[in-house]
């Protein structure tokens, strides 16, 4: 199969990369600003953002996973971060399928609790996105897992507590989180970092 052609069925091209049926080989994809690796490009396309995405840039200050903000054209003509794309560190999380099963289970449960409480679903619970093929995460050609969630506008992540009020608010939020999960079936959770 030559670059630039359409693959008719699942196959492995000479580079050793598995290609899904109907996907256009990588050389015909639109170049996305900020995307400098094949894995990141594959992930952007796997979640369905490739044709509309304005640009991608590193996001946050995490030390475990590799995180990117995905910017899309806004109605006002300005590019806006709408999604967070994250490569899960498999050196820490050996079973990404179990991590994602936990995340989808807990977030859906929390969203139902927030809905019942009349809360703001867009701000009070993470909203994860499945791949175009309906999977909870995408695995790139190197076996690296990627997940995606909606970006929460005007959210803040503190690396260090700067004032006592911040510590108080985080403790209050964590307590509320635990209360909401009080009846969650803990036996359905996987141990994602074994002892």
Tell where the protein language model's regions lie, with residue ranges:
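Glycine-rich hexapeptide-repeat left-handed beta-helix
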Residues: 1-35
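Compositionally biased, intrinsically disordered low-complexity regions
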Residues: 4-6, 24, 36, 50-52, ...
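General structural signal for secondary-structure boundaries
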Residues: 28-31, 35-40, 95, 163, ...
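Juxta-kinase regulatory segment immediately upstream of eukaryotic protein kinase catalytic domains
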Residues: 32-57, 106, 110
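Conserved ATP-binding subdomain of kinase catalytic cores across diverse folds
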Residues: 55-195
């Amino acid at each position: 199969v030559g670059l630039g052609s359409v693959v008719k069925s699942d196959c492995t091209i000479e580079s050793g990369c598995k290609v899904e049926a109907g996907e256009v080989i990588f050389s015909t994809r639109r170049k996305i600003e900020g995307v400098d690796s094949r894995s990141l490009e594959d992930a952007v396309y796997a979640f369905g953002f490739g044709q509309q995405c304005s640009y991608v840039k590193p996001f946050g200050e995490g030390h475990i996973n590799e995180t990117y903000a995905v910017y899309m054209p806004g109605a006002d003509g300005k590019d806006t971060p709408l999604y967070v794309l994250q490569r899960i560190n498999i050196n820490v999380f050996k079973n990404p399928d179990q991590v994602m099963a936990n995340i989808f289970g807990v977030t859906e449960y929390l969203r139902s609790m927030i809905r019942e409480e009349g809360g703001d679903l867009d701000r009070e619970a993470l909203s994860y996105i499945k791949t175009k093929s309906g999977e909870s995460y995408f695995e790139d050609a190197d076996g690296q897992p990627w997940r995606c969630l909606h970006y929460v506008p005007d959210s803040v992540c503190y690396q260090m507590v700067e004032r006592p009020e911040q510590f108080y608010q985080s403790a209050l939020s964590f307590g509320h989180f635990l209360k909401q999960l009080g009846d969650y079936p803990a036996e359905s959770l996987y141990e994602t970092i074994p002892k």
